[in-house]
């Protein structure tokens, strides 16, 4: 009886893995991957010149890497 149970379990595992292989497994939506891959760290934004470091001139919070503009200069925090 134990051998039959083990044999049935092995058969079920083999069938499920075969179904995953044929079906391509779990497919994640590409839009979600693209969205997450577009995010950059603060250092990457600064290195590529997309934001300004502290003590640089700014007009809006988005100008600063810290997202903290006092109206004239970027603040550190």
Curated annotation (Swiss-Prot):
It is found in: Secreted. Residues 1-19 form the signal peptide. InterPro entries: Conotoxin. GO terms for molecular function: ion channel inhibitor activity; toxin activity. Its main location: secreted. One of its GO terms (cellular component) is extracellular region. Keywords: Cleavage on pair of basic residues, Disulfide bond, Knottin, Neurotoxin, Secreted, Signal, Toxin. Expressed by the venom duct. Disulfide bonds join 51-65, 58-69, 64-74. Residues 20-37 form a propeptide. The presence of a 'disulfide through disulfide knot' structurally defines this protein as a knottin. Belongs to the conotoxin O2 superfamily. This is Conotoxin VnMEKL-023. It comes from Conus ventricosus (Mediterranean cone).
């Amino acid at each position: 009886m134990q051998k039959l149970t083990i044999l049935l379990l092995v058969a079920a595992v083999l069938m499920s893995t075969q179904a995953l292989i044929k079906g391509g497994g779990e497919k994640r939506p590409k839009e979600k991957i693209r969205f997450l891959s577009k995010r950059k760290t603060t250092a990457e934004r600064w290195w590529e010149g997309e934001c300004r470091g502290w003590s640089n001139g700014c007009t809006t919070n988005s100008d600063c890497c810290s997202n903290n503009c006092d109206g004239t200069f970027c603040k550190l925090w």
